Regions:
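Secretory/organelle targeting and membrane-embedding segments
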Residues: 1-145, 149-498
Length: 498
């Protein structure tokens, strides 16, 4: 590539060392970063160029998989790193940033200039204005912004206005790393590349859909951030609703950035508005409590002792369109769950007449499709088959596919894929301004309800469990239970390894 420069705000922070630098090294290792390029780190911590390179080299040795580490390649990669000690919250440093860019690239508008905001959200509205004041919002520049993009609908609109005053929409890349995962993208391929499933992908054949994205860790030293966010802002408003869109969207006429993102927005705009019954009965929020050697949320550093921040959310959603009317989507996310997993489970309707006995008398009769996004990525279809021997009893069995069966093909790093897309100018997997606002518009009533009703239920659940019992009660209204994932896709109800 010609004269590429990347400027990372928050270059001494956790996101940079854990995700961005390993992703950039991965691109370098795969020869996706070639030719003349410079990566300039911006942060308040004081480093020289050499000190910063040494720091990043140490972090790469910790956060890059051992089988991908190459001493010579890593040394070559960090030789392209530079550092400018600067407070991005103060405008006076930006002329110095402009000059450093010119020193590195020979011009203020290199062929490909990428800004990455790996900063606290409080700086999201400040940095672009200071870039504009310094004349750095050049025609060849792009800017990547991490979630959360806004705190609610009003703040999201204000941020969109700010960015629109500095950059064109095609220069703004709002990143959601879930969409960078190969398995998330494969949901689209599974649906639209296979004629046997798409005709069944509607209200006539699907009973309900579950989407689970949970972690087996707590807030991991992020108490200050999490107190202002909670599970709904941190996960539901962006990650989970994106997975709803991938599951429910119509096929684009032509697969390109505009058409794909148009269909995502249509799903968001079709979400059935939440009424008072929904707010009271179809949303369950929880907070993990101490269990065994695991702390409760209120015992975490940076958390108020009487905090009412949600670490678990379960919701029942509806989509008011021709394809999905009447099909509930149950989504949930939580911290301190028994395992870390993200998966989509599609429950098909039962056959209209049951001809056969069910082996054991207690096996599910409906087919179930599981799309596992992480870990142990794969797909499972559960179908009924005759039990060998006399009689005609049917038992549920699995047809499964694992990405590991492809034979050493890596699933790829989500950040590497998305950064590469941004370098190439492909915004397909990034969130557009209208999608941000449509998502917040749907969830804003929930936030207002909690604000206006501070005593709205917040259920405790012991750390290491599947969440509040009340979330099971919500599923029971549909005559169903949550599918609690096992470590391996092929585990059964009789054996479930976590």
């Amino acid at each position: 590539m010609d004269n590429f420069a990347m400027i990372i705000f928050g270059a001494s922070g956790d996101l940079t060392k854990r995700k961005l630098m390993p992703a950039l090294y991965s691109l370098y290792r795969e020869k996706r970063l070639t030719g003349e390029y410079s990566i300039l780190g911006i942060g308040r911590t004081v480093y020289s160029d050499d000190n910063y390179r040494s720091y990043i080299l140490e972090e790469l040795q910790q956060f890059v998989k051992s089988e991908e580490q190459d001493t010579a390649l890593m040394a070559s990669f960090v030789s392209h790193l530079y550092y400018l000690p600067m407070d991005p919250a103060k405008e006076e440093g930006y002329p110095q940033l402009r000059q450093r860019l010119v020193d590195l690239t020979g011009e203020v508008d290199p062929d490909n200039l990428l800004f990455y905001l790996a900063t606290p959200p409080s700086l999201y509205g400040v940095v672009p204005l200071y870039l504009k004041a310094a004349g750095l919002n050049t025609p060849h520049s792009r800017i990547i912004v991490e979630k959360p993009f806004g705190y609610d609908l009003e703040s999201a609109r204000e941020l969109n206005k700010t960015y629109a005053s500095v950059f064109n929409e095609h220069q703004i890349y709002r990143i959601d790393h879930f969409l960078g995962k190969e398995t998330a993208q494969n949901v689209l391929a599974f649906r639209f590349a296979n004629g046997i499933f798409e005709p069944l992908w509607n209200r006539n054949y699907i009973d309900y859909v579950e989407i689970t994205a949970v972690e087996n860790l707590g807030i991991e030293q992020r108490g200050g951030f999490y107190e202002t966010a909670g599970a709904l802002r941190d996960m539901v408003q962006n990650h989970l609703i994106q997975l709803v869109a991938l599951t429910a969207m119509e096929p684009p006429a032509v697969f390109n950035a505009d058409n794909f993102r148009n269909e995502v927005v249509k799903v968001y705009e079709s979400l059935t508005p939440l009424n008072e019954v929904d707010l009271n009965e179809h949303i369950v929020r929880g907070q993990y409590t101490a269990s065994g050697n695991k702390k409760g949320y209120r015992e975490e550093k940076g958390v108020a002792p009487d905090s009412r921040t949600d670490t678990y959310i379960a919701m029942k959603l509806g989509i008011s369109n021709w394809r999905w009317s009447g099909v509930p989507f149950y989504i949930r996310t939580g911290k301190q769950m028994p395992t870390k997993v993200t998966e989509i489970v599609v429950h098909f309707r039962e056959t209209p007449h049951q001809m056969f006995h069910c082996a054991g008398g207690n096996c599910p009769r409906a087919n179930k499709l599981i799309l596992r996004l992480q870990p142990n990525e794969g797909i499972v279809l559960k179908i009924g088959m005759k039990v060998p021997g006399a009689g005609f009893e049917v038992r549920q069995v699995t047809m499964d596919f694992s990405y590991a069966q492809l034979g050493g093909v890596p699933s790829g790093d989500a950040y590497a894929r998305l950064i590469d897309d941004c370098i190439q100018g492909d915004p397909t997997l990034f969130t557009r301004s209208d999608a941000v606002e449509a998502s917040w518009k749907f969830f804003d009533p929930v936030l207002r309800y909690w604000k206006d009703n501070p005593d709205a239920p917040l259920y405790g659940y012991p750390a290491g469990t599947w969440g509040p019992l009340e979330s099971e009660a919500m599923m029971h209204e549909h005559g169903a239970d949550w599918t609690n994932p096992c470590k391996n896709l092929t585990n059964t109800d009789q054996y479930c390894e976590l």
